[in-house]
């Protein structure tokens, strides 16, 4: 039994996340976690809300709330949204909680002891009208690299380049809109990444289980040359700059930069899990305490890759303490919305709470996995969503389950028949499974989720083709035993389809397996023997209860309604 630690990029606290956030980190991490649990492995999947920094302060101000109260509210909302999509976190923590604060201050102290933290005076944008410094997203303006007119002071949303507020052209205050700005000196702590460049490059070179997207982004940063980066900000909300509980002299009004403390939040959330009775957190994170046998897998969108392959490793490796580093990193491209990006700040696209108002979570889980933005960006359109759901879930899966279970009730008194001997059609179905099940498992292990979903769809389609070949409803008229073979095989396929569906559409999978009375200990992904055994695994004579309709078709009128509500194109 392997031990697998899974983290997904922390969802930021400034509002409900959109479907692009879900598709690029939390959902694939959950699919993978469920798969590995079904394979019998010891899995710990942790996540947390990322709560510090300027966006939290700005969002709280806009809501007219205290920032702590705002974060409390938003954490609960995001937790409920995750539950609505059946995200199976072992723990969902918060970066504003005590464990992350302690760990962030610990890492800063250790890095300074190693000579990797330096106090420096730098120039920052100051708003005369607001009487304050404008770090990060408190200032916006024109990107000096691509000309995007709404670039933020920390990063351009259009080209993805990291920025400093002083880099922006025609800057203005996000608080007041004032352009009455000047550059003033302020003192901050810097992480001396230039001293870590060789060590980080060697570590990236040795990381063999990353997709090309992640590797290319890491090397791009390294090839451009690492810069020493400020890790503190002139803000009130964040991890205080302190050592052993004592504020650092001259830094009383400053906090650590959110991108310094946020990745440490993976560890902090695991500490929270342990404190809540989960277990020993150090055995998952400290290689001197048992984590040397852990496989650590990270999931994130491509905009987070540089921070996870360069900045966070600089913290971990620079400490020279025995911390577990990532083994496998799965990075995703964008899920696009009619040619543009989903955007939290622009309120563009469909958000998780809105999606759940429209349809249950399984509809979205399947679509976002089958359409995962892996090799390239993936486009969301209502028409594509409708077509995929109706074809895969309502027709190929739902119709199969409905047809064979109801026929069993109609012609075999609702019990699994035992008569008849398998023949050519059953051998064909077994051969399909012998070919496709190993491919499915291999794709899941490789975290190739589109390919995995395609294999599941192909297995469902093969089941439908089998019923067309077997024709139990035709054979019943002249050879009940031959019909019984088709029904028995079909019902075993229903059970197998439910087992295979668990990582992707867990609620529907449970309905299928519960209807067949499949016990929990028979729901694992164990396909080591010949597939023919899977086609006769259910007890003969068992009672069959057809499940309720699993997936309703999406009608054209619904697509028209949703297009009207959410739009079919990004804002200009």
Curated annotation (Swiss-Prot):
It catalyses: tRNA(Met) + L-methionine + ATP = L-methionyl-tRNA(Met) + AMP + diphosphate. Its main location: cytoplasm. Zn(2+) binds at residues 143, 146, 156, 159. GO terms for molecular function: ATP binding; metal ion binding; methionine-tRNA ligase activity. Keywords: Aminoacyl-tRNA synthetase, ATP-binding, Cytoplasm, Ligase, Metal-binding, Nucleotide-binding, Protein biosynthesis, Zinc. One of its GO terms (biological process) is methionyl-tRNA aminoacylation. Its EC number is 6.1.1.10. A motif ('KMSKS' region) lies at residues 341-345. Binds 1 zinc ion per subunit. ATP binds at residue 344. A motif ('HIGH' region) lies at residues 11-21. Is required not only for elongation of protein synthesis but also for the initiation of all mRNA translation through initiator tRNA(fMet) aminoacylation. Monomer. This is Methionine--tRNA ligase. It comes from Maricaulis maris (strain MCS10).
């Amino acid at each position: 039994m392997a031990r697998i630690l899974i983290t997904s990029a922390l969802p930021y606290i400034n509002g409900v996340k959109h479907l692009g956030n879900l598709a690029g980190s939390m959902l694939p991490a959950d699919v993978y976690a469920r798969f590995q649990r079904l394979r019998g492995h010891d899995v710990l999947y942790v996540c947390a809300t990322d709560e510090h920094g300027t966006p939290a302060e700005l969002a709280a101000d806009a809501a007219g709330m205290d920032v702590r109260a705002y974060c409390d509210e938003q954490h609960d909302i995001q937790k409920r949204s995750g539950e609505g999509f059946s995200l199976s976190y072992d723990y969902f923590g918060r970066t504003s909680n005590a464990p992350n604060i302690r760990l962030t201050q610990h890492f800063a102290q250790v890095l300074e002891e190693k000579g990797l933290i330096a106090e420096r005076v730098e120039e920052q944008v100051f708003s005369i009208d607001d009487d304050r410094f404008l770090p990060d997203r408190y200032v916006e303006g024109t990107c000096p690299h691509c000309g995007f007119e709404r670039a933020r002071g920390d990063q351009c949303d259009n080209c993805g380049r990291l920025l400093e507020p002083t880099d922006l052209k025609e800057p203005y205050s996000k608080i007041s809109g004032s352009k009455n700005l000047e550059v003033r000196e302020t003192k901050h702590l810097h992480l001396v990444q230039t001293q870590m460049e060789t060590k980080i490059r060697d570590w990236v070179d040795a990381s063999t289980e990353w997709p090309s997207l992640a590797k290319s982004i890491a090397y791009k940063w390294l090839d451009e040359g690492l810069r020493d980066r400020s890790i503190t900000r002139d803000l009130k909300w964040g991890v205080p700059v302190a050592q052993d509980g004592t504020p650092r002299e001259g830094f009383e009004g400053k906090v650590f930069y959110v991108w310094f403390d946020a990745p440490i939040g993976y560890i902090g959330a695991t500490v929270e899990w342990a404190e809540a009775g989960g277990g020993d957190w150090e055995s998952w994170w400290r290689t001197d305490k048992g984590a040397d046998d852990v496989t650590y897998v990270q999931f994130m969108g491509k905009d987070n890759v540089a921070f996870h392959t360069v900045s966070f490793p600089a913290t971990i490796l620079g400490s020279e303490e025995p911390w577990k580093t990532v083994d496998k990193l799965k990075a995703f491209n964008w899920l696009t919305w009619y040619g543009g990006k989903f955007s939290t700040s622009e309120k563009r696209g469909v958000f998780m709470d809105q999606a759940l108002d429209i349809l249950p979570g399984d509809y979205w889980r399947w679509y976002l996995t089958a359409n995962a933005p892996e090799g390239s960006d993936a486009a969301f359109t209502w028409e594509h969503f409708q077509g995929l759901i109706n074809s895969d879930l309502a027709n190929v899966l739902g119709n199969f389950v409905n047809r064979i279970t109801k026929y069993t009730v109609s012609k075999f008194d609702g019990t699994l028949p035992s008569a008849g001997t398998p023949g050519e059609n059953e051998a064909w179905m077994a051969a399909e499974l012998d070919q496709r099940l190993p491919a499915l498992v291999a794709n899941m292990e490789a975290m190739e989720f589109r390919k995995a979903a395609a294999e599941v769809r192909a297995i469902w389609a093969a089941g439908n083709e089998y019923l067309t070949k077997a024709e139990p409803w035709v054979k019943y008229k002249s050879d009940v035993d031959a019909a019984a073979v088709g029904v028995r095989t079909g019902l075993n396929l229903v059970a197998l389809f439910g087992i295979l569906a668990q990582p992707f559409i867990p609620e529907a999978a449970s309905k299928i397996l519960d209807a067949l009375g499949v016990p929990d200990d028979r729901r694992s992904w164990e396909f080591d023997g010949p597939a023919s055994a899977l086609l006769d695994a259910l007890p003969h004579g068992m009672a069959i209860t057809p499940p309720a309709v699993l997936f309703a078709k999406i009608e054209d009128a619904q697509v028209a309604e949703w297009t009207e509500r959410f739009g079919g194109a990004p804002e200009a």
